[in-house]
């Protein structure tokens, strides 16, 4: 059993720690949707789909990390995994926690797709709490 979300989050964390400009993440639809949300929320600079050929074609997502120009600190301060394969965390829309009084977000997997905690609350949809980011 593979944990693609966990691998993606660890690659992003490690790239931030060593101040890489970009990181390659294996393409899955779930990874792409989550990264697109993080880009829209301002945590990432941009994302591109890249193809690499070896014996067969592999798709990757090239994620360009966003840093503050003056302090060279990342816009992502912390990523905290909430739901994992061994312990799933589900909640309804009224009990979705707030991160740092709204400065951070929680990514929620709902029946309507992957969305932020703000969108899930406004649409009155609960689901699985994947991770928090601030």
UniProtKB/Swiss-Prot annotation:
Keyword Ribonucleoprotein in annotation: yes
Alphabetical list of Gene3D superfamilies matching this protein: 3.30.1370.30, 3.30.1490.10
GO biological process, one term: translation
UniProt KW rRNA-binding keyword: yes
Keywords: Chloroplast, Plastid, Ribonucleoprotein, Ribosomal protein, RNA-binding, rRNA-binding
Cell compartment(s), UniProt: Plastid, Chloroplast
SUPFAM superfamilies, per the entry: Ribosomal protein S8
Known role: One of the primary rRNA binding proteins, it binds directly to 16S rRNA central domain where it helps coordinate assembly of the platform of the 30S subunit.
Oligomer status and interactors: Part of the 30S ribosomal subunit.
Record PANTHER family: 40S RIBOSOMAL PROTEIN S15A
Name used for this protein in its record: Small ribosomal subunit protein uS8c
Species, as recorded: Bigelowiella natans
């Amino acid at each position: 059993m593979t944990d693609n979300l966990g691998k993606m989050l660890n690659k992003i964390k490690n790239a931030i720690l060593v101040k890489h400009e970009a990181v390659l993440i294996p393409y899955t639809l779930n990874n792409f949707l989550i990264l697109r949300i993080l880009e829209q929320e301002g945590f990432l600079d941009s994302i591109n789909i890249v193809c690499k050929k070896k014996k067969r074609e592999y798709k990757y997502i090239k994620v360009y990390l966003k840093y503050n120009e003056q302090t060279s600190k990342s816009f992502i301060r912390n990523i905290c995994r909430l739901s994992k394969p061994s312990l799933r965390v589900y909640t309804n829309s009224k009990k979705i926690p707030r991160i740092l009084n709204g400065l951070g977000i929680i990514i929620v997997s709902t029946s309507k797709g992957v969305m932020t905690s703000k969108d899930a609350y406004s649409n009155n949809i609960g689901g699985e709490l994947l991770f928090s980011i601030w």
